[in-house]
Curated annotation (Swiss-Prot):
<dbReference type="Pfam" id="PF03884">
    <property type="entry name" value="YacG"/>
</dbReference>
<dbReference type="GO" id="GO:0008657">
    <property type="term" value="F:DNA topoisomerase type II (double strand cut, ATP-hydrolyzing) inhibitor activity"/>
</dbReference>
<comment type="similarity">
    <text>Belongs to the DNA gyrase inhibitor YacG family.</text>
</comment>
<keyword id="KW-0479">Metal-binding</keyword>
<protein>
    <recommendedName>
        <fullName>DNA gyrase inhibitor YacG</fullName>
    </recommendedName>
</protein>
<dbReference type="InterPro" id="IPR005584">
    <property type="entry name" value="DNA_gyrase_inhibitor_YacG"/>
</dbReference>
<keyword id="KW-0862">Zinc</keyword>
<dbReference type="GO" id="GO:0006355">
    <property type="term" value="P:regulation of DNA-templated transcription"/>
</dbReference>
<feature type="binding site">
    <location>
        <position position="30"/>
    </location>
    <ligand>
        <name>Zn(2+)</name>
    </ligand>
</feature>
<dbReference type="GO" id="GO:0008270">
    <property type="term" value="F:zinc ion binding"/>
</dbReference>
<dbReference type="InterPro" id="IPR013088">
    <property type="entry name" value="Znf_NHR/GATA"/>
</dbReference>
<feature type="binding site">
    <location>
        <position position="7"/>
    </location>
    <ligand>
        <name>Zn(2+)</name>
    </ligand>
</feature>
<comment type="subunit">
    <text>Interacts with GyrB.</text>
</comment>
<feature type="binding site">
    <location>
        <position position="10"/>
    </location>
    <ligand>
        <name>Zn(2+)</name>
    </ligand>
</feature>
<comment type="function">
    <text>Inhibits all the catalytic activities of DNA gyrase by preventing its interaction with DNA. Acts by binding directly to the C-terminal domain of GyrB, which probably disrupts DNA binding by the gyrase.</text>
</comment>
<feature type="binding site">
    <location>
        <position position="26"/>
    </location>
    <ligand>
        <name>Zn(2+)</name>
    </ligand>
</feature>
Length: 79
């Protein structure tokens, strides 16, 4: 028994079985359109930031030497 789903791009009915080459898409064209949407960030998975962006400003993250001054892997002799 096969399942029928809608193509995520154009909503055309697609039979979901082993022979469906582009599942869940109806065609390579729809598959590539979807890929392009992800690549251009038109599609995105929403993520809540773990911290407030204002904290980066308070830490001096925007200063040019932030990473140079806070590198734990570099000792003062290598500068």
């Amino acid at each position: 028994m096969s399942l029928t789903v809608k193509c995520p791009t154009c909503q055309t009915p697609v039979t979901w079985n082993a022979e469906a080459e582009f599942k869940p898409f109806c065609s390579e064209r729809c598959k590539l359109i979807d890929l392009g949407d992800w690549a251009s960030e038109k599609n995105a998975i929403p993520v809540k930031p773990e911290f407030a962006p204002e904290l980066l400003d308070q830490l001096g993250y925007d200063d040019a030497d932030f990473f140079l001054d806070n590198n734990p892997f570099e000792d003062d002799k290598n500068r």
